């Protein structure tokens, strides 16, 4: 569906660029109608004799040049929905389609339905900055609530007009002859396959949808129920069952206390990796609000709804708290040392009933090397009588249970694999760029990117939550918004300047990797731990800096870091058009620059006292 409103045809259609260009454009843009001399209000906008002595002929379009483009977005989670809001807001004449393989929106929050699934950062920091929700039930809201928030955001901003659900991407191929992406799509409800094309392709799949099963001998020989945390069987009754759980990451930390509380369950938790379990993020704010536990009372939620200033102040404190702990990620800082001591004391207290578990689970590496999670109820569950903490390595899986290296068979009725995802990997479908290079081949040694959002050899392809995109502290949704804003600026440049291919230089990708490697040397992420952030000794998952650093880095694109292919024109200044603007042709808002929303009035008597630029340095 086209992002509305579109401009009148005379404003965006291409006129003749030079005497032999018609054939070129007919071949490159067969579906684009063009006229040689558009008129508006009874006069032609083209000069009667606009050919210069060099043979240059004006491109008969207004300076804004909002030529038609097609954009395909893969994924309807936080990132895809953001594009469904901002592209129609900021761009015109863009035909936008958002494909998602699921039956509903929300991405990972639609797919993950295991018991206890929730965000492990404060809910009010895990939302769009422009669409705050005062009604979160908990400091760590459950998955269904997050999915409902995303669905309501889709409805609020009419994003559903662009979304096609149950549409699975099968392949994406760059066609250099037409400068288009050819995307093969399968409708899952009918098994019909078709091909779509786009000028720009945005991968908004995220990193939490390609399931990673454990590589253990005999996994499929188990005769009982087996499920992955991301492929949960909601119909299975765990009551009175012996449950084996493999994993100690974020999902396992949420699943274990949920299953432990069910009637007559017996849990065998196979945990090899040591990990830090932090106190709840935002604990000081909870104490200030007088919260008993993590649930917001009805009175507190009503206060958020009825008092915008109070709600905004609460949000500000949460965000500031997340951003002020960046020093925790740097080796040797006082904050890092203090955090480790605090975590040790907190974990000892919560594991006091079985102190030996503390010795088994306490890491040798610094807090933050692995992803920190508060894990409400996790440590408390480990000390309960119906939970066995097993550190022995798994040798194999048999039909009746799990055999550890000491030869013991741990009989179970159901096996839960909380083993995460293939993060930082290419999509599970072929993506082919210049000269037939596949992304899997391109990333064979390392997932490479430029500022996390583009990679060389793949023109007009942008990534949300690509390599080196996650954050060690602060707001992930602000990272998503910042990357999305950058991508939309790129689309506008492509549209306005008659660019048909835009690809980051390989040298700039190499420079970004060199910067990233140098930055991470002094961080806790290079400590001795096993983390999805890393591939060997290289950090591939995290942004090399703080969230505020990322927001500023993406604020003003360095256009010189890209290579461009243009429409065949005699002069690359043809983007200047015919000397007219859209406002003049439409006869409206001819002095818009005097309207209050476009005015930037300096402070008197000292312009440098402008408070906005004291908070944040000016940039364009």
Regions from the language model: what does each represent?
Residues 124-154, 158, 308-362:
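Conserved N-terminal/central alpha/beta ligand/cofactor-binding core
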Residues 9, 19, 37, 66-69, ...:
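Beta1-alpha1 glycine-rich phosphate/pyrophosphate-binding loop at the start
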Residues 22, 279, 308, 449, ...:
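C-terminal, flexible cofactor-proximal segment of oxidoreductases
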Residues 215-226, 400-453:
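Central helical "cap/lid" subdomain
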Residues 165-180, 387-405:
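A conserved short coil-to-beta-strand element within the FAD-binding core of flavoproteins
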Residues 1-71, 89-93, 114, 194, ...:
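Extreme N-terminal leader/targeting segments of oxidoreductases
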Residues 61-68, 72-73, 78-95, 102-104, ...:
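Rossmann-like dinucleotide-binding core of oxidoreductases
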Residues 137-208:
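Feature captures the FAD/FMN-dependent oxidoreductase FAD-binding
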């Amino acid at each position: 569906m086209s992002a509305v409103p579109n401009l009148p045809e005379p404003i965006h259609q291409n006129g003749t660029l030079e005497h032999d260009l018609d054939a070129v454009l007919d071949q490159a843009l067969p579906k684009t109608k063009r006229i040689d001399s558009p008129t508006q209000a009874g006069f032609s906008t083209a000069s009667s004799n606009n050919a210069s002595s060099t043979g240059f002929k004006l491109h008969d379009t207004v300076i804004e040049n909002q030529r038609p483009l097609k954009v395909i977005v893969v994924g309807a989670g936080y990132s895809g929905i953001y594009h469904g809001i901002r592209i129609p807001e900021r761009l015109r004449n863009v035909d936008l389609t958002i494909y998602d393989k699921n039956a509903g929106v929300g991405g990972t929050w639609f797919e993950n339905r295991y018991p206890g699934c929730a965000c492990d950062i404060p809910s009010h920091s895990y939302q769009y900055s422009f669409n705050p929700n005062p009604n979160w039930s908990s400091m760590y809201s459950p998955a269904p609530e997050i999915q409902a928030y995303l669905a309501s955001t889709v409805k609020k901003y009419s994003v559903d007009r662009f979304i096609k659900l149950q549409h699975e991407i099968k392949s994406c191929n760059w066609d250099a002859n037409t400068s288009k992406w050819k995307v093969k799509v399968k409708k899952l409800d009918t098994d019909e396959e078709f091909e779509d094309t786009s000028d720009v392709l945005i991968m908004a799949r995220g990193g939490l949808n390609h399931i990673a099963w454990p590589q253990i001998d005999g996994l499929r020989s188990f005769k009982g129920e087996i499920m992955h945390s991301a492929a949960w069987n909601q119909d299975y009754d765990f009551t009175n069952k012996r449950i084996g759980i493999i994993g100690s990451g974020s999902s396992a930390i949420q699943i274990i206390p949920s299953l432990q509380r069910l009637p007559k369950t017996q849990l065998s938790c196979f945990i090899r990796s040591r990990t830090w379990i932090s106190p709840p993020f935002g604990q000081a704010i909870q104490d200030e609000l007088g919260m008993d536990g993590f649930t917001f009372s009805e009175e507190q939620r009503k206060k958020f709804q009825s008092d915008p200033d109070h709600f905004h102040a609460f949000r500000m404190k949460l965000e500031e708290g997340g951003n002020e702990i960046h020093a925790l990620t740097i080796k040797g800082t006082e904050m890092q040392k203090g955090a480790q001591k605090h975590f040790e004391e907190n974990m000892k207290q919560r594991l006091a009933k079985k102190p030996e578990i503390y010795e088994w689970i306490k890491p040798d590496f610094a807090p933050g090397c692995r992803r920190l999670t508060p894990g409400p109820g996790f440590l408390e569950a480990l000390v309960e009588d119906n939970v066995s903490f097993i550190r022995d390595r798994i040798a194999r899986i048999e039909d009746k249970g799990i055999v550890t290296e000491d030869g013991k068979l741990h009989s179970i009725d159901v096996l839960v694999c909380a083993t995460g995802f293939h993060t930082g990997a290419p999509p599970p479908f072929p993506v082919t760029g210049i000269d037939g290079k596949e992304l899997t081949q391109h990333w064979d040694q390392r997932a490479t990117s430029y500022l996390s959002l583009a990679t060389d050899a793949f023109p007009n392809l942008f990534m949300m939550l690509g390599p080196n995109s996650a954050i060690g502290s602060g707001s992930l949704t602000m990272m998503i918004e910042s990357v999305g804003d950058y991508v939309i600026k790129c689309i506008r440049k492509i549209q306005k300047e008659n660019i048909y291919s835009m690809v980051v230089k390989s040298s700039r990708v190499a420079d970004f990797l060199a910067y990233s490697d140098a930055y991470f040397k002094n961080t806790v992420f290079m400590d001795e731990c096993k983390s999805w952030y890393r591939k060997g000794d290289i950090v591939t998952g995290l942004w090399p800096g703080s969230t505020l650093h990322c927001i500023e880095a993406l604020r003003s694109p360095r256009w010189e870091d890209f290579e461009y292919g243009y429409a065949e024109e005699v002069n690359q200044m043809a983007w200047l058009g015919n000397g007219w603007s859209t406002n003049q042709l439409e006869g409206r808002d001819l002095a818009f620059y005097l309207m209050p929303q476009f005015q930037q009035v300096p402070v008197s008597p000292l312009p440098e006292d402008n408070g906005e630029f004291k908070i944040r340095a000016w940039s364009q």
